[in-house]
């Protein structure tokens, strides 16, 4: 779990560096092809509050090694992030988040840039969570991946939970 938190923190730092080094260039996006998220973004409700990632810090990336594919999807704002990892990715379909398969994870993160050790992360699945959500890939092309998601996540520091609902993504692949 400590390694996972370190990897998540590293991904957040890379995203923040990317955010500060990019120019302001908005291509407008498209209608999302039936997915609520605008092109290049992740949207969701976090305990009822709206989240929409910035296009310049949102991406999907798939890597194949050892006969297995891993899909990573990430998007963040200046103060929040959502990160989803599907190990054993096999294209369009539904991937359950359950404590029986800890190789599929989703996280909601509130980074603390001035003091990274105080970054708060809520992760799904967690111990004894059972099925706590799903990631549904509805469309994949050579350049994009689209779908929906929802999950209940837990903060291992204070045992609080965050309900991430009505999630959708329309991400460009790197």
Regions found by a protein language model. Give the residues of each.
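Surface-exposed helix/loop patches within compact recognition domains
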Residues: 42, 56-142
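Bacterial N-terminal signal peptides
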Residues: 10-18
């Amino acid at each position: 779990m400590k390694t996972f938190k370190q990897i998540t923190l590293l991904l957040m730092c890379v995203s923040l560096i990317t955010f500060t080094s990019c120019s302001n260039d908005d291509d407008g996006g498209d209608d999302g092809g039936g997915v609520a998220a605008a092109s290049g973004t992740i949207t969701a409700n976090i305990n009822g509050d709206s989240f929409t990632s910035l296009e310049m810090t949102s991406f999907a990336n798939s890597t194949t090694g050892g006969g297995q594919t891993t899909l990573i999807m990430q998007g963040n704002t200046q103060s929040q992030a959502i990160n989803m990892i599907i190990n054993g990715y096999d294209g369009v379909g539904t991937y359950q988040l359950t404590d029986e398969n800890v190789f599929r994870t989703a996280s909601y993160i509130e980074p603390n840039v001035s003091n990274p050790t105080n970054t708060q992360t809520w992760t799904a699945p967690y111990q004894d969570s059972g099925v706590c959500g799903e990631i549904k890939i509805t469309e994949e092309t050579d350049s994009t991946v689209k779908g929906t998601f929802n999950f209940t996540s837990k903060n291992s520091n204070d045992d609080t939970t965050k309900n991430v609902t009505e999630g959708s993504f329309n991400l460009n692949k790197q």
